[in-house]
Curated annotation (Swiss-Prot):
Sites carrying sugar chains: N408, N819, N906, N1160
Record's bilayer topology term: Single-pass membrane protein
Similarity comment: family membership: Belongs to the SPATA31 family.
Compositionally biased residues, Pro residues: 241-260
Name of the protein in question: Spermatogenesis-associated protein 31E1
Subcellular location: Membrane
Comp. bias intervals (Polar residues): 664-681, 906-915, 1148-1165
GO cellular component: membrane
InterPro entries named among the record's database cross-references: SPATA31, SPATA31F3-like
Chief location: membrane
PANTHER family: ACROSOME-SPECIFIC PROTEIN, SPERMATOGENESIS-ASSOCIATED PROTEIN 31E1
Function: May play a role in spermatogenesis.
Region (Disordered): 90-115, 169-262, 411-430, 460-557, 592-619, 637-761, 894-966, 1143-1242, 1254-1280, 1378-1445
């Protein structure tokens, strides 16, 4: 055969077999190639395919491959970064829009931020890629070593089955390194060796491994064998298992890994058991630590990595500590336990130093691993905490820097802290393991936390050591530890080997009882002996519960339950807790059966009862039954409240550390109605008190939910001075006295477990209801209602004696008129009054309308006049003096009970001498409204006349000058300009203050607190008014003293309508002397007339406020405009405070006349209850209050007679004076019916005649003087001439009186303000000057005045029916407005009709002098002023007609 050239490859020259190179031969046929040649050629063609793989797998090519991979990855990353940084220019803004200078900056900053963010992302991605590349590199290295024969330590032994091995995979596969996988292949790689730090903890000496460190491998040390704790193989960790250290004293049930959330359910299903202690040694070398770092670094669960290192360190550290220095020793064989490891052949690890690892490198690796694991742990924890913000850590997180070193780098083994023993010393079963794993799995906030519970262990009775038992280590148990039943013999723990920490024996002083852990409650597992654990912070703090305990050696420490119970509570639901209650009771019975030794009594200063980590129901106690009680109590509390970690039992459940009571202090009422025996006296005292207080305080937050309701019964053994610890409900109202302070204030809010919320709510409601009922029974009105804006401003004095306010009777239909504007504190008082008046008027117009006539007077006078029981009348807003139903005797009680009406109203309604220390504020509208009903009930004795006025005043309000200084006392009198009857309410004030019996009557009607009540009551007593008035007057005469309140005008008027009462209250019985005549006139009036008048007054009840301009300096600057219907007084000083609709046409002249006569009438304005300072007539003020009050025993008598005379003359002048004020007369004439006017005229005439017969003309001159003083409203010329004419004819006086009495509604409508002011001033002056002696007149005089008034009414009735009626009424109003006519004329606008109807005597005779010309003059003015009768005047007129009929 010729030489053939076989091509071996591209560009490759073949070799001739002979070795000679032959030029390419000429083409030959292919037949020359034999089959062998083809085969050879084919074989050689395959060689290039093998060479790359060989090159790739060649160890020498590994660096090149690594470089290539890294370079490619880096290139990709850089390219990605470049692409991110490359960006197009932003689009230019629209042409029509200018870009601000800041926009480019913002865009640039935004770009820079985006670049930074993208760069960071790229860096992260790069790091991940690098990690993956490194992992791949490690994988390649291991593979190459296997192929190249390197790493003999990793080659499996000849006959050893590998079984489960850990096969690392790239991180991208989302499978953590070390995931357990079945690999039957004998060429499978062994898992990475255990971390280098573990090697550092081993005793010095060569380290050998019997086989690949896997689930079948065990360690044997060249030195003495070390006891190791069993560990499980979590799925997330490289399958590295540290063999447990067997215990020579017997097997022990395996325990779960520490309760970490990351560990739950992450087990390989293998049960950890001790490893055989004897096995052939196999000299193996640990693999390089780098693989360990990579595996750990790429682990999906760094927390587990950290835990593994910690566990290993703990295991080895404990073993080295127990042995001191490691000595060569073989572990005992435990074939039965070795079977769990799947290796029938025992194997051992020879402990020794890792000489192949440099100490510095090892230390660095350890630091890096620890930092990385800690960082990831914190990151995961923060992430989970953010996911569960409501859950907070119960203890301090484990800090790797504060723990003892995990690994001992030095050649000499260092002694780690001796193992701690668990307080409960119980063995935990698999079920408990599972439960606790689930617990920590459910509590992400507890991840990898070193939750430790402080356990006080004393090796001797005097020494105490605080040890922290990490809860995550509590699960580990020592093999061979005998099980111990939970009993009082906890201190009798079996002796441990010398190399193990002996369980600490409990001192006899310790309470043997201890709350069983929740796990025990759930699983009824046995208590386990102490378990070694890492020593944590030395301070005795239960980080799980946050309760600090004293380290003092003076007090014996107690075994405190570990924190795992409290940690589990957040996840335990009520039903679950209920299910485990039986076990709790059983365990508590078993554990707490032993008696407790005597404990010191003193309580540690650092005791924090709030955070006492004691399970309710498991309180330490010597007696089992009591513990049963406590257990049941705790059960109910747990059912209703929740976990015990936050629940504080009642008093007894929380005991200070040094104060364990032998018996529970008390038991919850809902659980057991009977109280258990109280704590021994040794534990009584301050400490106990504090504990009780703390218990209730802590349980207070549950009381609202009905969670905890406990009532501490009397404990004879405890300090009585400790005070009650029961929950006080609704004790905020300290104003209530007497009956209001009842046992219900101390009723403990208890809730039964059946329905605690409902029970608690019912208790609260019952308490509140009882309180309100008590207030209602006592006549107290709720604070929000009882106080008007005036009362809110003035302090309500509390009477020294426990005076009960009278009951509040509602007026007409049980409705009490309450001023609800008090809440509007931001409003000015004047504005508030205006609003109230408008509201009331609106109600009257739309609701009442003309139905006032249908109203029937109520006979409130239920008893004789009596002296007020208390010298000082404090009119409480809630006082029921308002009620008309109350008898007169009760009125003084009200007066005594009532706080002062006005701010500074220090008036005393005592019969001795009521003194008004300050300006009297207008009574609250509620009082007015309430008083209105008893309009007819005025103090009959002293205020017979005022009664008549109240009827007339009923509808009208009273305006009260802020102050009326009578006898040096500032009175805030209110001029009650009621429907035609501006009758002064002097009677109440003077009578009540002056005389005992008389004083109380007067005080009722006139007293600032309840001036109108007595009058109203008297007025309401229609049938027996005269007799009662006479009796009252007599009584007043007997005990009457000159009241400091001189003139209370309008009080009597409001008595009938309630406005009278209000006026009296506001005026405070001021100037009762001036009022008596008016009051007597009211008394003299017929019941029907009084009733009608009262209705009219209540309807109209308008208080005219004189303009400040018109007011004279002598007059009080602010007259309260009061609506009789509402009883509201407006402090405004201007007429325009009231709307035009509210003001009557006669109000303007009234205001004028009032302003004119106001000076003179300051003290004498009885009809209107208008109390002026009396600056107009100083003499009037000074003698007024004392004179009028002192000489006049009964205000009514004095007022009737004296006012009659005084009013005659003043009215004469008034009429003349009123001639100038036709507006008032016209308004009155139009407003009142002819019949009413005639009646009023007749009454006035009669009264004037009587007065003239008696020769009571001085008032006229006095009034004339007053008129001269008041040029605005009254013209002395006309007033004088008319008075003269009236005096000559005698009719004008009657007419004036009629305008006063018969036209109370009429005059009230026409010239309420003018006449009221004039009358008040004139009456005050008359009372001071001349009527003072006449106050002593008895009811006979009143009757006589009554007859006079009636006669006077009859005279002017004709005129009133016709046009003359209007004229005369106008004249009378003018007279009333005039200083002389004012005594009764000023009230005349308000009271004239009421007075006529009630008592003609009410309108003083001074009006008789009014000449017909005066009325005529007034008529045109009235017509011009009003143009027509006011709607309210029309109603008043209709009322008058009824009265006349």
């Amino acid at each position: 055969m010729g030489n053939l050239v076989i091509p071996l490859g591209k560009g490759r020259a073949g070799r001739v077999e002979s070795g000679q190179r032959i030029p390419p031969p000429a083409p030959r046929p292919s037949v020359e190639c034999t089959g062998d040649d083809i085969a050879l050629q084919m074989e050689k063609m395959l060689f290039p395919l093998k060479s790359p793989s060989a090159t790739w797998l060649s160890p020498s090519s590994t660096p090149w491959m690594m470089d290539f991979i890294l370079t490619s990855v880096c290139g990709l990353v850089l390219l990605f970064l470049l692409l991110l940084y490359v960006h197009s220019d932003p689009p230019s803004p629209p042409p029509g829009r200018k870009r601000s200078s800041r926009e480019p900056q913002r865009e640039r900053s935004g770009r820079s931020r985006s670049r930074k963010i993208s760069a960071l992302k790229a860096c992260r991605i790069l790091l991940r890629e690098l990690e993956e590349t490194r992992d791949l590199n490690y994988l390649l290295e291991s593979h190459l070593r296997k192929l190249a024969g390197e790493g003999s330590s990793h080659l499996p032994l000849g006959g050893d089955p590998l079984g489960d091995v850990c096969k690392p995979v790239p991180a991208k596969a989302h499978q953590p390194h070390g995931k357990c996988m079945q690999d039957p292949s004998p060429a499978s790689l062994s898992p990475p060796a255990p971390p280098a730090p573990l090697a550092s903890t081993l005793s010095p000496g060569p380290m050998t491994f019997s086989e690949p460190f896997g689930p079948h491998s065990t360690l044997s040390a060249s030195g003495p064998p070390e006891p190791l704790l069993p560990l499980k193989c979590p799925a997330t960790q490289p399958h590295v298992v540290f063999p447990p250290s067997p215990q020579p004293h017997g097997p022990l049930a395996s325990s779960p890994p520490p309760p970490d959330s990351s560990l739950a359910g992450l087990q390989c299903g293998s049960t950890t058991c001790p490893v055989p202690q004897s096995s052939p040694l196999h000299n193996q070398v640990l693999p390089p630590p780098t693989r360990v770092i990579s595996g750990l670094g790429c682990s999906s669960d760094p927390i587990w990595d950290l835990y593994c290192w910690r566990e290993a360190a703990t295991t080895w550290g404990l073993s080295t500590y127990s042995h001191g220095k490691s000595q060569p020793r073989h572990l005992p064989d435990h074939t039965s336990e070795a079977s769990f490891w799947g290796d029938p052949t025992p194997k051992h690890m020879e402990v020794g130093g890792c000489t192949f690892i440099h100490p510095d490198v090892q230390k660095l690796l350890e630091t890096l691993i620890a930092k990385r694991a800690l960082m990831k742990m914190w990151q995961e924890k923060e992430r989970k905490r953010a996911d569960h913000p409501h859950m907070t850590s119960l203890g301090k997180e484990w800090d790797i820097t504060t723990l003892n070193p995990f690994w001992n780098v030095s050649t000499q083994p260092q002694q780690l802290p001796r193992p701690q023993q668990v307080s409960d010393a119980t063995t935990v079963g698999n079920h408990l393991q599972q439960k606790r794993s689930q617990l920590f799995w459910d509590l992400p906030s507890l991840n990898s936390e070193s939750l430790a519970t402080t356990v006080w262990v004393s090796r001797n009775p005097s020494s105490q050591n605080a040890h922290s038992v990490p809860l995550d280590k509590a699960s580990t148990s020592l093999p061979g530890e005998p099980e111990v039943e939970a009993s009082s013999q906890l201190s009798q723990a079996p002796p441990q080997p010398h190399h193990m920490a002996q369980p600490q024996h409990f001192t006899p002083a310790w309470p043997q009882s201890q709350p069983p852990p929740l796990a025990e409650i759930q699983t009824q597992a046995h208590l386990s002996p102490p378990v070694p654990s890492l020593g944590c912070s030395s301070p005795p703090q239960i980080r799980g519960c946050g309760a600090s305990y004293p380290t003092s050696q003076e007090r014996t420490q107690s075994v405190i339950p570990t924190g795992k119970e409290y940690l589990e509570w957040p996840l335990k639901k009520r039903p679950k807790w209920k299910r485990v209650l039986p076990s709790l009771l059983k365990k508590s019975q078993a554990v707490l059966s032993q008696p407790t030794a005597h404990l010191p009594q003193e309580r540690p200063a650092s005791w924090s009862p709030k955070s006492a980590p004691i399970l309710p129901g498991v309180v330490t106690s010597p007696e089992l039954p009591e513990h049963w009680w406590q257990g049941r109590n705790a059960i109910h509390q747990e059912q209703s409240c929740g976990p015990p970690s936050r629940l504080q039992a009642s008093g007894d459940l929380l005991q200070p550390d040094g104060e364990f009571p032998g018996r529970p202090q008390s038991q919850a009422e809902d659980t057991q109605q009977a109280l258990l025996p109280s704590q021994p006296s040794d534990f009584a005292g301050k400490g106990r008190k504090d504990v009780q207080k703390t218990g209730f305080r802590s349980s207070g937050r549950f009381s609202d939910k009905g969670c905890l309701g406990s009532k501490l019964g009397p404990d004879p053994s405890r300090d009585q001075g400790s005070g009650r610890t029961s929950v006080k409900a609704l004790d905020e109202d300290k104003e209530a006295e007497g009956d209001l302070r009842r046992s219900w204030k101390y009723q403990s809010v208890s809730s039964t477990p059946r329905d605690p919320d409902k029970e608690h709510l019912e208790n609260k409601l019952q308490i509140h209801l009882a309180r309100k009922v008590g207030e209602i029974k006592e006549g107290w009105i709720p604070m929000p209602v009882r106080r008007s804006w005036l009362m809110a401003k003035c302090a309500v004095p509390k009477s020294d004696t426990h005076r009960k306010p009278g009951k509040l009777a509602s007026w007409r239909g049980g409705k009490a008129h309450v001023n609800t504007s008090q809440e509007l504190s931001f409003l000015h008082p004047c504005t508030q009054q205006i609003l109230e008046v408008h509201l009331v008027r609106f109600c009257v117009r739309h609701s009442w309308g003309t139905d006032l006539q249908s109203l029937e007077p109520i006979n409130v006078w239920s008893g004789e006049a009596q002296a007020p029981p208390f010298p000082q009348s404090t009119f409480t807003p809630w006082a029921s003096w308002v009620s008309r139903v109350e008898s007169v005797p009760k009125v003084p009680i009200f007066l005594g009970k009532r706080p002062q009406n006005g701010p500074g109203d220090n008036r005393t309604t005592s019969k001795s001498v009521p003194t008004v220390s300050g300006p009297l504020a207008a009574p609250p509208p509620e009082q007015e409204g309430v008083q209105r009903p008893p309009r007819g009930s005025q103090s009959a004795d002293t205020h017979g006349r005022s009664e008549a006025f109240p009827t007339g005043h009923k509808g009208r309000g009273c305006s009260q000058p802020p102050t009326c200084s009578l006898v040096g006392r500032t009175w805030q009198s209110r001029t009650v300009l009621e429907s035609g009857k501006p009758k002064p309410r002097l009677e109440g004030s003077m009578g009540s203050e002056m005389a005992g019996n008389e004083a109380w009557l007067e005080s009722e009607s006139m007293s600032p607190g309840d001036p109108c009540s007595s009058r109203a009551l008297q007025v309401l007593s229609i049938g027996s008014q005269w007799a009662r008035a006479e009796d009252a007057l007599q009584a007043l005469k007997v005990g009457e003293k000159p009241p400091t309140w001189e003139v209370t005008l309008g009080a009597s008027v409001r008595a009938s309508s309630g406005s009278v009462q209000e006026d009296l209250r506001s005026t405070g019985a001021l100037g009762t002397t001036g009022n008596p005549s008016a009051s007597s006139v009211c008394v003299a009036q017929d019941p029907e007339q009084l009733h009608l008048k009262a209705q009219v007054v209540s309807e109209i009840a308008l208080i005219v406020q004189v303009d400040s301009e018109e007011q004279l300096p002598g007059r009080a600057p602010g007259i309260l405009l009061q609506d009789g219907a509402t009883g509201l007084c407006l402090p405004g000083r201007h007429m325009d405070m009231l709307t035009a609709a509210d003001r009557l046409p006669t109000q303007a002249p009234l205001s004028t006349s009032q302003s004119v006569s106001g000076k003179n009438m300051t003290a004498s304005q009885g009809p209107c209850a208008l109390l002026w300072k009396g600056g107009d007539s100083p003499g009037q003020q000074e003698p007024g209050s004392p004179k009028a009050k002192a000489p006049q025993k009964s205000q009514k008598t004095l007022g009737c007679a004296d006012k009659g005379e005084a009013h005659r003359r003043p009215r004469t002048g008034e009429q003349g004076h009123r001639s100038k004020g036709p507006r008032t007369s016209e308004a009155s004439g139009r407003s009142h019916p002819a019949q009413a006017r005639e009646i009023g005229d007749k009454q006035e005439r009669k009264y004037n005649q009587l007065q003239l017969e008696k020769g009571q003309t001085p008032p006229e001159s006095h009034f004339q003087r007053k008129i001269s003083h008041h040029p605005q409203g009254l013209h002395p010329r006309k007033g004088g001439t008319r008075w003269e004419d009236v005096l000559q004819k005698g009719k004008p006086g009657a007419d004036a009186f009629q305008s006063w009495g018969s036209g109370p509604p009429r005059q009230f409508m026409d010239c309420m303000a003018d006449k009221a002011w004039t009358i008040s001033r004139v009456v005050g002056q008359i009372l001071v000057d001349k009527l003072g002696l006449q106050w002593g007149r008895g009811p006979s005089e009143v009757n006589r005045h009554k007859g006079d008034f009636r006669a006077q009414e009859n005279v002017p009735s004709c005129c009133h029916r016709g046009h003359c009626h209007q004229e005369r009424s106008r004249e009378m109003r003018a007279l009333a407005c005039s200083p002389k006519a004012t005594p009764k004329g000023h009230h005349c606008p308000v009271k004239n009709r009421g007075i006529r109807d009630r008592d003609s005597s009410w309108a003083p005779p001074p009006r008789e002098p009014v000449s017909p010309a005066g009325p005529h003059h007034h008529r045109p003015r009235m017509a011009s002023t009003s143009g027509g009768p006011h709607p309210q005047l029309q109603e008043l007129m209709s009322a008058q007609r009824c009265l006349a009929s």
